[in-house]
Amino acid sequence: MDTDKAIFMKILIVEDEPSLRELMQKTLAKERYVVETADTFYEASLKIADYSYDCILLDIMLP
């Protein structure tokens, strides 16, 4: 992976399971991505309204 480009990529993780959310966040942060998380759709929608993310990882089974 080209880690120089990863520095500038911002990713939003939307996951209600804390252990999975933390694992994804730590893994991506280790690769030098800027990572934000949300555990509800509402929280994610507020973050999306304020910032344009390069990638959103969304739990499709979110309650």
Model-assigned labels for residue ranges:
Residues 37-55:
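Acidic, metal-coordinating helix/loop segments flanking the phosphotransfer/catalytic sites
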